[in-house]
Each structure stands twice: as C-alpha cells, then as structure tokens.
Amino acid sequence: MTIPVTIIGAGLGGLTLARVLHVHGIPATVYEAEASPTARTQGGMLDIHHHNGQLALKDAGLHDQFLGLVHEGGEALRVLDRHGTLVFERPDDGHGRRPEVLRGALRQLLLDSLPAGTVRWGHKVTAARSLGDGRHEVTFADGTAVTTGLLVGADGAWSRVRPLLSAARPEYAGAVFVETYLFDSDERHPASAEAVGGGSLFALAPGKGITAHREPGGVLHTYVQLAGEREWIDGIDLTDTDTDTGAVTARIAKEFEGWAPELTALLTDGET
C-alpha cells in the first residue's frame, strides 16, 4: 500500500518528483496556481548539470528525450567589459557537462510524461495546516480543500507550505533584474547578436551588469541587473498596461551611460 502524495507547484522540481514517483508506481497529484501550461512565459535557458539535474532526469527515465532538447552551442561563454571589449571567451566544444535547454521545453517534456489529470490547474493555495498524525490540509483560493498523508511544497519563493517547517521568508537582497527580449537578432540586431555569440554573455561592473543568453530561433534573452535600495524599483510595474515602459527603460538605461551600444541595445531595443 502506498500513501498518495500531494505536490504543490508544477514547476520543474514538482513535476520531476511527480514523474519519478510515477516511474516507481507511486501516485501523486500536483496542484498548480496557473490556469494552464501556457498561462505565462516560462523563463529562459537553464544549464542542467551532470551531477544533479541530469541524474534526476535519468531517474525519471527522460534523459534521452532531454538530450533532444539541448540548445547546441549554448555552453559557449563570452565576458565583455562595459566598452564591449572581449575579456574572456570559452567556446562550446561539445564536451561540456551542463548543457542548456529552454525551461519551457523541459517543463513540457515533464508534463507530457505524466498521466492525464496528474496536474490540477487553477488551484492557487492560500493556506496549509497540519492535522496531526502526519496529515495535512491544503486550502485553495476558491474555498475548496484537500487532505493528504504526504505533502510536498514545490511552490517557489512565496511557498504556502514552507511556513509549516520554517519561519524564513524571502527578503530583498539588494538587487533587481529586468528581463528583455530581442527577436530575429541576427537580422535585426546584428551587433548585439555578435556580442552575445552562441551561448551566454556577461558584461559586469560594480553594482550593475548585463547578462544575455541566445535562445533557439535567434532570440536574445537579457537580464539587466542593478544593485540599489528597494525604493528605487518600488512602484514600477512593467506588466501594467498603464506603465510608460519607454520612460522606465530610459530610467534604467541611464544607469548604463557610456556603455557600448551593442550592450545597451539589449535593453533599449527590447521588444517586451
């Protein structure tokens, strides 16, 4: 007899666990706040290390399929200074041990490997409490609840399960990251595409930096990093349709005055 497992969160961790349990004949149900697998973008490239992530995929029986998703050339690395001068370069020779893959593609692989109905979409957890004797109750935003003999929290930074084990809460660490995308970069943004190369780019300075990854289809996915007080970024909501994104972009770009144009274009020419 096995105890059904309840997993909160259909991210990579929760789905990998559900798949490994399925391989071993242990039923699990995954509850996810998002309405569907395509409710939002799923982030950029992930490097899956040989000593942990790939081991989990082997246990899940999905390693061969994972290899088919690998972005060839994605382990290449370029480091530039603020003037665009190459400081360090490491090509992808095909012998690396941390291949890059799109997070969304890996998530879909995991979803497709699970029995229909394993993931319950649109179930946002509002509370979790112990019932004693190893059982727990999970309450959802729609007022419904489930009880379970084994509860796993895989629901990220703002986990509703973690408080059962720890009083720790996320705290502002002193830096913010702003994401941008450039599409069809080789044709439309050739200077930036050349700067990034075939894999990852790092252009860092004290208190700030520009990091970018090349994704399949000529997409450049950039993270602009700034250190500073939380108040600097509070009140800016780039997802709000009423936000003047041009003004916000200009405000952030001002912090990179004097940087090489092929680097700042990763921010100022961003299409999202």
Functional labels for PLM-detected ranges:
Residues 8, 22-42:
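Glycine-rich FAD pyrophosphate-binding loop
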Residues 2-5, 20-22, 47-185, 229-239, ...:
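Conserved N-terminal helical subregion
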Residues 6, 29, 221-223:
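A structural signal for isolated positions on well-ordered beta-strands in alpha/beta enzyme cores
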Residues 1-13:
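Beta1/beta-strand and adjacent pyrophosphate-binding region of the FAD-binding site
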Residues 194, 198, 205-208, 214-216, ...:
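FAD/FMN-dependent oxidoreductases across multiple families
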Residues 26, 62, 261:
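Short phosphate-binding/catalytic loops that engage adenosine nucleotides
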Residues 130-133, 213-217:
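Short beta-strand micro-motifs enriched in acidic
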